[in-house]
Amino acid sequence: MRLLSTKLLSANFKDRLIHQGFLLVEFPFIQIKPIPSKINKVHNNIIFTSQNAVRLALNEPNISPKLEGKNYFCVGEKTKLILEKEGHKVVKMSQNASFLADFISKNYINESFSFFCGKQRRPEIEKVLAQNETPLILHEIYDTLYTPKAIESRFDGVLFFSPSAVKSYFKSNTWKAGMHGFCIGNTTAASLSKFTKNYSVAKSPNENQLLLSIHHYYTHDYAQK
């Protein structure tokens, strides 16, 4: 089976796919562009909903010193691991922005938050915290650029890791018969559902679960067609 990944994969994930017999092509359909930011004030509670924001913030000399000793609230297991690897305290990790916003609104009523994010993002954090009058400072530190490419070769499956990658893919491509999509999470799946019903979603937004989703489809669902 031939798979197309819409981003460059980790060496471990790529090796595991190849070991299972998949032929793999990687092409990044989005590019992350840092936005120069002058950060003056950072609250004691910090929100991250993407790995890109974490990596950029931790590697930016103007930002990184201001992040020491804070409480962190994040979306995604990998985001949590990056923060903890750098010695930061993660108070709460949720699987998506809606769950995290709900947790904060119920448990941190009188607290203030700083949200490091991209220009293109889900609205839940801002919407829910505003409804509960929770003070929130936004720090937009990157933008997501589309890098679409027309794919001429035939693939059996396409791996998607963000709604932005879905949008970029369909700027230059259509969904061909017989193809199946594999989504890292529900927000990505919601974007793909506008173009096809042929997709699977990882039970949790991580590489292990995505690999299980791919394996299950091709050993059960696909085999029964």
Tell me the role of every PLM-derived stretch:
Residues 1-225:
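Signature of uroporphyrinogen-III synthase
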